[in-house]
């Protein structure tokens, strides 16, 4: 009896590799182990338990006028460790098929140690056409982004977002045209109930992006794009003791342009945006209430506009120094604000934000060690209801130091 059982177990074990393989499929695992050690001289806006650094927080005086936010903070984390799988499958007609599944632990929830989806999509690729279905990088992130060590990858100057989308691209040797319809999941807009995907869900209108890129000889990349977002902040209002069904909508557009040059041993990259209500992409921005209907409390909205730009220089390969400079200016709202206390977004009381970042990394096959120093200054003030601009400003500054170790596989 025992020999028969052993034979059956051996047969099953030998069968597992056969079951695990699919004809005309190939699989490639990749990822890294990442460790971040950081220190700040004051409190910061930094999701993911302080790893995703954005900007210094405003002064918070106590009863004696002492700034509560002036104290230092720091920690050491490894939860942004990543694992991914690239899949190539059989042709569908004349189209090549592929898929990607990518995960890590560095989400924006209160418990960042939980596994989450970074990317999960399938793609159909013809010679000049590609259709992508699933979650991947927001098209505003694009092909041009900073090469820095901080996890935020240039935010809040560089859009940072991965979302479910339908993306079509038309490609020639040097030109790529992109059109995307994007929905929200992990990175969500602000509104009356905080950050939520419900504002887009109730809107029934996804984000839209169209853009064009020019690439030449693996040296130059240049392009531009336009983005539209339309939210439904509320479905009902509470007005003078009654509840009313309302149909509210906030719609606005943003524009971006980018360029990058890759030389023999250096790179220069830059991006600029006229951004409106892009707080879900980790940029400063949002919207406020323009007017209130006295009959039922229905609200009209107006979006804040920000001019944001960054430039990035890198040199070398094994030893690689890099410089990053980012700047944002609050341009106010298109219409007046009915209430400056009820605003939805991030950093709407900041007039200007300037961050300078200098880093040095040592790169080996499968290894990276780096050190980064960052100086960030934010000019906080009062929002003017007439035009949404920030006045009577004062500045706060944070010095951030980051140590990084990464092992790639």
What is each of the regions a protein language model found here?
Residues 43-48, 110-117, 143-151, 188-198, ...:
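Outer-membrane beta-barrel translocator domains and adjoining extracellular loop/strand segments
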């Amino acid at each position: 009896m025992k020999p028969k059982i052993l034979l059956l177990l051996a047969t099953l074990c030998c069968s597992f590799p056969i079951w695990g393989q699919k004809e005309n499929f190939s699989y490639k695992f990749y990822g890294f182990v990442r460790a971040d050690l950081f220190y700040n001289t004051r409190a910061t806006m930094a999701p993911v338990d302080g790893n995703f650094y954005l900007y210094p927080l405003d002064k918070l005086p106590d009863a004696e006028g002492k700034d509560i936010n002036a104290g230092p903070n720091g920690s050491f984390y490894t939860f942004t460790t990543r694992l991914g799988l690239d899949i190539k499958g059989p042709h569908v007609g004349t189209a090549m098929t592929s898929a990607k599944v990518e995960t890590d632990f560095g989400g924006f929830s209160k418990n960042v140690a939980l596994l989450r989806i970074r990317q999960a999509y399938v793609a159909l690729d013809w010679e000049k056409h590609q259709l992508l279905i699933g979650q991947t990088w927001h098209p505003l992130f694009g092909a041009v982004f900073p090469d820095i060590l901080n996890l935020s990858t240039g935010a809040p100057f560089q859009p940072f977002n991965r979302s479910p989308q339908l993306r079509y691209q038309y490609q020639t040797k040097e030109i790529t045209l992109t059109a995307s319809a994007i929905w929200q999941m992990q990175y969500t807009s602000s509104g009356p109930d905080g950050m939520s995907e419900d504002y887009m869900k109730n809107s029934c209108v996804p984000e839209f992006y169209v853009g064009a890129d020019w690439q030449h000889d693996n040296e130059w990349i240049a392009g531009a794009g336009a983005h539209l977002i339309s939210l439904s902040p509320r479905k009902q209002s509470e007005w003078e003791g009654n509840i009313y069904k309302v149909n509210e909508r906030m719609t606005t557009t943003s524009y971006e342009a980018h360029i990058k040059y890759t030389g023999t041993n250096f790179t220069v990259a830059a991006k600029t945006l006229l951004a409106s209500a892009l707080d879900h992409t980790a940029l400063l921005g949002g919207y406020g209430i323009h007017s209130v209907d006295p009959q039922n409390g229905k609200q009209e909205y107006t979006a804040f506009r920000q001019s944001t730009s960054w430039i990035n220089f890198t040199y070398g390969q094994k030893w690689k120094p890099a410089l990053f400079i980012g700047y944002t200016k609050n341009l106010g709202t298109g219409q007046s604000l009915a209430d400056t206390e009820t605003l939805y977004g991030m950093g709407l009381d900041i007039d200007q934000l300037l961050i300078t970042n200098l880093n040095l990394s040592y790169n080996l096959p499968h290894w990276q060690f780096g050190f980064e120093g960052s100086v960030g200054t934010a000019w906080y003030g009062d929002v003017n209801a007439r035009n949404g601009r920030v006045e009577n400003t004062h500045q706060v500054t944070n010095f951030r130091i980051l140590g990084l170790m990464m092992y790639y596989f």
